[in-house]
Amino acid sequence: MKITTSKRFINCLILTTFCTVLFSSATVDETENYLSTKTVIKTIVIDAGHGGGDGSTHGAFSKEKDVALQVALKLGKAIEKNLTDVRVVYTRTTDVFVQLYDRVGIANREKADLFISIHCNSMPLVSQRYVVKGKAYYRKVPNPTTRGTETFVAGFNRLKEQDVAIRENASILLEKNYKDNYDGFDPSDPESYIIFSLMKNAFRDQSIKLASLVQDEYVNTGRVNRGVKEQGLAVLQKAGMPAILTEIGFISNAIEEKYINSDEGQAEIVNNILQAIINYKKDVES
């Protein structure tokens, strides 16, 4: 067993080295081309995570797919109102399932200048002890303590840090011919992420810049900052523009679930992301 694992790891390392060399020059060329030809933010694609039969995670009274759609639609309207020179495109406007490769495909076909995917975070269920007539029982309940926001860009993540990537990429399994769509990538195999992460996004630096601006805005309104992180996320990996996935809060946390479902909370989140876009747009167009 150890020998097999070692061989697989060595093969991954060899392929890692090859892919790094293969993609690095193309990445530099694509980035330079973007910076030299796209100096104006004209089109932004807003992606509401999950949808339809893919509800993903849920809280005590709400589902991620519904909250993500509400925030995505409000964000799109806010962009159209405040940035009249920007065209907004949605990957979905109703409760339907859109395949991950179709989401980024929409952005690429529309020649988008930014891709922003809206999601809710969640922690695994934990055991809770309760007593009935002197007898102890245990039940699984949402983790009530973890909270905050984090924003992801496409990139490499260590094996032990793949929880978010595995959860978000699980949507792939709902797609027909998913192995063909993602070049054999298996979202349930941790070793697949080593290679998948090497499909270097040409717009890493720009994506990190936008993600950092989003996190800064969250912090300005008192949110807990969990930082900007790189993950092998299928919805971002093949984007032909700066792309981020922002987790607007933990739906598994009772306080944050109420916040991200409230009109006030959603308005604040939308304003955070909008202001980050405005700041990013001002910077790249100057």
Located regions from the model:
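Catalytic-site microenvironment of enzymes
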Residues: 1-286
